[in-house]
């Protein structure tokens, strides 16, 4: 396990002013209550890295495009970014690629976390194989209760200071936006129409999983965005709603 307490502290301090109404964005991703998996089961999964350390996840959209969260790329230069693909382990294996450019959604708001999505263009084209594949993006939301899987190298407990070397995944259920903002859970009006929720008791994404994929029916339906703690029964994980951004993703992938 890699000790990253200092890194997490720096990130928390740097972004303290952007936390919406006391809620903690899932910076750097985490999987709580999950299981070890392999990149062959999630070949679209990538690790975003700076200075040799994993800090966010992402999803392969095409041979040279990755989808991630806008909050992952605040105050970041493209020249400092690397993306590891095709490996179950964020520290080794697969291949590492430089980043040519990226674009955050122009409507991203760090206080409310709306439009928390970004497009990254890799410097060189990826060679697809069993461990490196693009994922199709959703053009409509999955039904309430549909099974979904989120994967990543995030911490395994809320506030954790270590991240696993091995890729983890957890199975969740989709929660309709109207239900997610209802009194059943604790978010209320903080849940916006650009967001999607997913939930299972004591299971969740966590710090370090940010930007990573939520997949249902072999489609990318969500991008790990934020939440209150990790695995809290009152607070589902909150994701950028990929179907809502379908046209933006297609357009920006051509332009970035």
Curated annotation (Swiss-Prot):
One GO BP annotation of this record: proteolysis
Principal subcellular localization: secreted
Domain Peptidase S1 as annotated: residue spans: 31-254
Catalytic activity: Preferential cleavage: Arg-|-Xaa, Lys-|-Xaa
Cellular compartments per GO CC: extracellular region
Location of the protein in the cell: Secreted, Extracellular space
Keyword Metal-binding belongs to the record: no
Similarity remark: Belongs to the peptidase S1 family.
SMART domains named in the record: Tryp_SPc
Disulfide bonds: 56-72, 180-197, 206-230
One Pfam short name: Trypsin
Source domain of life: Eukaryota
Cleavable signal peptide: 1-22
Cross-referenced InterPro entries: Peptidase_S1, Peptidase_S1_PA, Peptidase_S1_PA_chymotrypsin, Peptidase_S1A, Trypsin_dom, TRYPSIN_HIS, TRYPSIN_SER
Record protein name field: Trypsin epsilon
Organism name: Drosophila erecta
Propeptide stretches in the record: 23-30
Keyword tags: Disulfide bond, Hydrolase, Protease, Secreted, Serine protease, Signal, Zymogen
Record-listed E.C. numbers: 3.4.21.4
Enzyme class, UniProt record, top EC level: hydrolase
Active site: 71, 116, 210
Residues carrying the site annotation Required for specificity: 204
């Amino acid at each position: 396990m890699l000790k990253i307490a200092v890194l997490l502290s720096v990130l928390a301090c740097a972004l303290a002013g952007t936390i919406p109404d006391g809620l903690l964005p899932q910076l750097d991703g985490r999987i709580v209550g999950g299981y070890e998996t392999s990149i062959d089961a999630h070949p679209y999964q990538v690790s975003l890295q700076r200075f040799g350390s994993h800090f966010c996840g992402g999803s392969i959209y095409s041979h040279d495009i990755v989808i991630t969260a806008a909050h992952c790329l605040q105050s970041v230069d493209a020249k400092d970014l690397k993306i590891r693909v095709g490996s179950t382990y964020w520290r080794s294996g697969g291949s590492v690629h430089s980043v040519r450019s990226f674009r955050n959604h122009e409507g991203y708001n760090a206080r409310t976390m709306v439009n928390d999505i970004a497009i990254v263009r890799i410097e060189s084209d990826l060679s697809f194989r069993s461990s490196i594949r693009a994922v199709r993006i959703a053009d409509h939301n999955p039904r309430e209760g549909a099974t979904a899987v989120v994967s990543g190298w995030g911490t395994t407990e809320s506030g954790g200071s270590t991240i696993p070397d091995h890729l983890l995944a957890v199975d969740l259920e989709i929660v309709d936006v109207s239900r997610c903002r209802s009194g059943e859970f604790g978010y209320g009006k903080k849940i916006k129409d650009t967001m999607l929720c997913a939930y299972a008791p004591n299971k969740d994404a966590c710090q370090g999983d940010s930007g990573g994929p939520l997949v249902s029916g072999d489609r990318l339906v969500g991008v790990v965005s934020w939440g209150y703690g990790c695995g809290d029964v009152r607070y589902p994980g909150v994701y950028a709603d990929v179907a809502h951004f379908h046209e933006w993703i297609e357009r920006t992938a051509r332009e970035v």
